[in-house]
C-alpha cells in the first residue's frame, strides 16, 4: 500500500488540516491520493466532519463509509466511544477498508485519532493500525511549549515498534507564539536525530492557509 499514516502528539494539533493539505498537494501533482479516517468521534452537527474534509480534499466520489467506517457521537477515543454505544471497532475491518481504497487509488493518507497510543479497539491502539497497514508515519505536533517532550515520546514509541517515521511537522494552530517556538525544532532534532520537516506558519484566512500548507508540505513530503 502506498501512502502515509498521519498521527499527532495530541488531539487538536492539526492532523486533519495537514492531511488535507497533503492530499491537495498530491492531487495537484497528478497523484490520485485519497484520505481515510478509520474512526471519528465527537462530530459537531452542522460542521464538516473530518471524513467529509478528507473526502473534499481528495476530490473523489467515495461514499463516506468508504472514507470512515466508524463514526461515534461522544468526543472520546474510538474504543471508549464505541463502548458507550454498545459497539466495537474491528482492526480487521479498518484494514479491509484501507486496502479497498488503495486498490481504487494510487495512494492513501490515513489520519488517526488523537495520538499514536490512543485506543482504536478494545485491544489495539493506532500504533497497531499503522503497523498493520505498513505505512510510514508522519508526526504532527504543536509548535509551542511542551512539544519537545510530546514529540520525542511519540518518535521513541514509533521506533520501539519498528515503525518507519516519515517525518515531523510542527504546526502553529493559533496566532500566539511563546518563546519556545523558534527553539523547538532544534531541540527536537537533537533529541530524536530527526530534523522537523517544517514549522508551519499561522494564517487566519482558511483558504490562504490551506494553500500555504499545501505548498510547503507538497515540496517536502513524498509518498
UniProtKB/Swiss-Prot annotation:
GO cellular component term, pick one: cytosol
EC number(s) reported in the record: 6.3.3.3
Protein localization: Cytoplasm
Keyword Metal-binding: yes
Pfam families registered for this protein in UniProt: AAA_26
InterPro entries documented for this protein: DTB_synth_BioD, P-loop_NTPase
Entry's Gene Ontology molecular function annotations: ATP binding; dethiobiotin synthase activity; magnesium ion binding
Disulfide-bond pairs as recorded: none
Catalytic activity: (7R,8S)-7,8-diammoniononanoate + CO2 + ATP = (4R,5S)-dethiobiotin + ADP + phosphate + 3 H(+)
Top EC category: ligase
Predominant subcellular localization, coarse grouping: cytoplasm
Cofactor field: Mg(2+)
Pathway: Cofactor biosynthesis; biotin biosynthesis; biotin from 7,8-diaminononanoate: step 1/2
Chain sites annotated for binding Mg(2+): 16, 50, 111
Keyword rRNA-binding applies: no
One annotated GO biological process: biotin biosynthetic process
The protein's role, per its UniProt record: Catalyzes a mechanistically unusual reaction, the ATP-dependent insertion of CO2 between the N7 and N8 nitrogen atoms of 7,8-diaminopelargonic acid (DAPA, also called 7,8-diammoniononanoate) to form a ureido ring.
Family: Belongs to the dethiobiotin synthetase family.
Protein name, as recorded: ATP-dependent dethiobiotin synthetase BioD
Organism, scientific name: Anaeromyxobacter sp. (strain K)
Gene name per UniProt: bioD
Amino acid at each position: 500500500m502506498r501512502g502515509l499514516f498521519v498521527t499527532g502528539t495530541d488531539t487538536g494539533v492539526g492532523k486533519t488540516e495537514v492531511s488535507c493539505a497533503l492530499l491537495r498537494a498530491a492531487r495537484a501533482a497528478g497523484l490520485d491520493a485519497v484520505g481515510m479516517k478509520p474512526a471519528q468521534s465527537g462530530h459537531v452537527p452542522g460542521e464538516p466532519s473530518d471524513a467529509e474534509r478528507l473526502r473534499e480534499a481528495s476530490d473523489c466520489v467515495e461514499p463516506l463509509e468508504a472514507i470512515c467506517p466508524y463514526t461515534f457521537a461522544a468526543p472520546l477515543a474510538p474504543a471508549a466511544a464505541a463502548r458507550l454505544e454498545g459497539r466495537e471497532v474491528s482492526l480487521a475491518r479498518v484494514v479491509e477498508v484501507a486496502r479497498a481504497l488503495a486498490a481504487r487509488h494510487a495512494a492513501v493518507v490515513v489520519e488517526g485519532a488523537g495520538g499514536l497510543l490512543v485506543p482504536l479497539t478494545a485491544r489495539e491502539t493506532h500504533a497497531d493500525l499503522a503497523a498493520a497497514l505498513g505505512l510510514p508515519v508522519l508526526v504532527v505536533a504543536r509548535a509551542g511549549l511542551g512539544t519537545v517532550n510530546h514529540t520525542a515520546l511519540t518518535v521513541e514509541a514509533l521506533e520501539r515498534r519498528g515503525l518507519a517515521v516519515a517525518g515531523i511537522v510542527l504546526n502553529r494552530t493559533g496566532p500566539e507564539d511563546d518563546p519556545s517556538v523558534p527553539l523547538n525544532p532544534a531541540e527536537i532534532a537533537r533529541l530524536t536525530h530527526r530534523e522537523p520537516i517544517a514549522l508551519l506558519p499561522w494564517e487566519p484566512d482558511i483558504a490562504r492557509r490551506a494553500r500555504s500548507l499545501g505548498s510547503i508540505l507538497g515540496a517536502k513530503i513524498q509518498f
